[in-house]
Structures are given as C-alpha cells and as structure tokens.
C-alpha cells in the first residue's frame, strides 16, 4: 500500500518543477506587457490576461477550429510526402556507400538551405493555395528523415545481414526482415525532428497569400489591429506544437 501510494506523490513531485516553470514564464510575460510596457504601448495588447477572451472570440466567430483543421491537414500531407521520399532515399544511401559518397555534397548543400527560401519558387510552380505550403512543409521535414534513416542503416551490425544471407534471404527479404526493424528507432527520431521543423515552417508558409490556416489568421488579426487575437493564435500554435511532440513521443516510443 505504501509503495502504491508513493507513486502518485512521485509523479506530482516530478511535475511540480515544470508547473513552476510555466507559472514563472506566464508571470514574466505579464510583467513585461503590463508593468514594464508604457501606458500607451501596443505591447499591452499582447498580455496573457487578454488571451482567454481572444480565443473565445475566435471560437465564437467560427474561424479558429477550421483554421486549425486546415493547418493540421497541410502538416500531415507534407509529412506523408517527406516520409514517402525520405525513408527510401535514406535506405538507398545507407545501403550503397558509393551512392552516398557521390550525392553527399548535393544533400549537404540542399539541407543547409532554409525551407522558406524556396517560397518564391513554390508559389511560381504551384500558385497560391495548399500546394506551396505542403511543398515547403515536405522540404523542411524530409532531411532529418533521410539523414537518420541513412545513419540507422549504417549502424546495423553486419553480422545480422551475414546471417540473413547464410539462410538464403533475398535482398528484399533482408530489407523487410532485418533492416527495417533495425532502423525503426532512427527513423522515429528523424520523424520527430522533422515534425518539429515542419510545424515551425508551416505557420510562415501559410502567410504566402493563402486565406486559411493559423499563419493566415495571424496576418488577418494583425490587419484588423486585433493584437490580442494575434497573441491568442501564437499561444494556440505553441500548445498544438507541444501536444504534437508529446503525442509523437507516446506513439513512437511504444515497443
């Protein structure tokens, strides 16, 4: 009974520092926007005390939930494209050292370019709408998946492949029975990193002339001088990003 009762106390004790950090951050936010800011400063409109009412207003207008849904759809499609391209490419580079050596300069060059730098090209190719946003999300998240998949393949014990070959396993069977299970961890890590980068890139990508999504809603609120709504959307973006990372950890860390 004592051991069982001690577990909830340990969990509470583990969460107390995190809760304290959140409270301290919100308090600092309030001090900067309410006490430090000048009486007529627009900075006061960004205070935490305005956020709940602004979120309620966005919900009453029926714009917040549809914008969240659109942003999530663009994120998921972009990530699906990144995984579809990144995992096979990572397998190819990991299995063929000569290919990896040949394309390494190109890969390093491309991955060092900010995904948002491709925005003018994306708009020129796809026009205004979902497509350029999805393209930028995919371009942002594909490289962590490629690099982690390649590293995962390179780290496989050669003895495992040798055993598979000794049993007469074909190349396809080696990939499905040995390589893919062995690189699960690195691929999951690449996906989590790619997810975080994709979410960061998504919001500015939605400011490229589209008329939906959380990025668009920030611009729309700014144009209406509704700075409390700007801050509210920023808070929503942060909360969703935190929830996505937590969900990815829970789902991907399952044995």
Regions found by a protein language model. Give the residues of each.
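Transmembrane alpha-helical segments of polytopic membrane transport and secretion proteins
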Residues: 1-23, 27, 246-255
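Periplasmic/extracellular loop-to-transmembrane helix junction in inner-membrane transport proteins
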Residues: 7, 35-81
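Alpha-helical membrane-protein architecture signal
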Residues: 52, 61, 65, 69, ...
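Transmembrane-helix boundary motif in ABC transporter permease subunits
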Residues: 77-107
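Generic hydrophobic transmembrane alpha-helix motif, especially the helices
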Residues: 108-144, 151-152
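Glycine-rich helix-loop "coupling/hinge" segments at transmembrane-helix boundaries
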Residues: 124-125, 153, 200-237
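Transmembrane alpha-helices
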Residues: 135, 139, 171-205, 231-232, ...
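Short cytoplasmic-facing helical segments at TM-TM junctions of multi-pass membrane proteins
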Residues: 145-193, 218
């Amino acid at each position: 009974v004592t051991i069982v009762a001690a577990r909830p106390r340990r969990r509470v004790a583990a969460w107390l520092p995190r809760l304290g950090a959140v409270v301290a951050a919100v308090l600092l936010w309030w001090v900067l926007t309410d006490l430090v800011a000048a009486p007529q400063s627009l900075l006061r409109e960004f205070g935490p005390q305005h956020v709940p009412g602004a979120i309620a207003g966005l919900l009453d207008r029926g714009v917040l939930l549809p914008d969240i849904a659109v942003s999530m759809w663009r994120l998921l499609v972009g990530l699906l494209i990144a995984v579809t391209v990144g995992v096979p490419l990572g397998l190819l580079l990991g299995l063929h050292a000569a290919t990896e050596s040949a394309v390494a300069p190109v890969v390093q060059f491309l991955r060092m370019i900010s995904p948002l730098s491709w925005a003018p090209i994306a708009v020129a190719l796809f026009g205004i709408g979902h497509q350029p946003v999805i393209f930028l999300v995919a371009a942002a998240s594909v490289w962590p998946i490629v690099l982690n998949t390649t590293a995962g393949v390179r780290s496989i014990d050669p003895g495992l492949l040798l055993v598979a070959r000794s049993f007469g396993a074909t190349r396809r069977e080696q990939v499905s029975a040995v390589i893919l299970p062995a690189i699960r961890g690195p691929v999951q890590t690449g996906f989590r990193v790619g997810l975080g980068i994709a979410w960061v890139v998504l919001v500015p990508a939605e400011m490229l002339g589209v008329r939906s999504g959380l990025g668009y809603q920030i611009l729309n609120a700014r144009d209406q001088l509704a700075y409390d709504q700007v801050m509210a959307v920023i808070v929503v973006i942060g909360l969703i990003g935190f929830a996505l990372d937590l969900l990815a950890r829970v789902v991907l860390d399952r044995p």
